[in-house]
Structures are given as C-alpha cells and as structure tokens.
Amino acid sequence: MQVLIGTKLVTEGIDIKQLMMVIMLDNRLNIIELIQGVGRLRDGGLCYLLSRKNSWAARNRKGELPPIKEGCITEQVREFYGLESKKGKKGPACWMLWLQDRPVC
C-alpha cells in the first residue's frame, strides 16, 4: 500500500500510482487544496487532516480563501462552487472532518 505524508505541498503535481492514503499535518487548507489533495487518491483511499483547532485561524491571511471548517466537507465544496444544497441529506460522498484540540505529534 502506498502512503503519502506531507504538508499542503503534496496537493500539487504529485502522481503516485496505487496511492491509498494521504496524511497532511497541521495544515491550513482551503477547499481548492483539499480537492487537489484528495484527488491524489485512487479507488476509495483515505485522507487524514491532522491539526489543532486554533492553528488555522491564527495563520489565516487577508485575501486568502478561508480554510476548511470542521464538519461535512461535501457541503463546503457545494458552497464554494455555488451548487444547490439538499439540507438534511448526506449522500455517500459526504465525509466529515474533525479537528483535534491538542498538539499534533
């Protein structure tokens, strides 16, 4: 099994065959970077984002896209692209993000 561990730089330009897991540490990803990172996976692989709750908010700079939020990523992608949301319905593509409020080791 191929596993990729890295910063948000792994979201751009890397193509690894049979990649089944991506682990990104203490990142401040926005929706575009998240989509690029998850796009590296094949055949239902897993993506783990590990960070502290206040690490993203503290580093957000003026003019950048807002970082992703804890909760349903599918809804955030729909909002970003201006797509209609079906409130209360979570299909198989909806996956959740929980941020840890403790140091990442």
UniProtKB/Swiss-Prot annotation:
Q: Which residues form a coiled coil?
A: none
- InterPro entries per the record? Helicase_C-like (IPR001650), P-loop_NTPase (IPR027417)
The protein's induction, as recorded, is: Upon SUB2 overexpression.
Every Helicase C-terminal domain range: 2-44
> By its UniProt entry, which SUPFAM superfamilies does this protein fall under?
P-loop containing nucleoside triphosphate hydrolases
Task: Spell out the family assignment given in the record's similarity comment.
Answer: Belongs to the helicase family. Yeast subtelomeric Y' repeat subfamily.
- Record's protein name: Putative uncharacterized helicase-like protein YBL112C
Q: Which organism is it from?
A: Saccharomyces cerevisiae (strain ATCC 204508 / S288c)
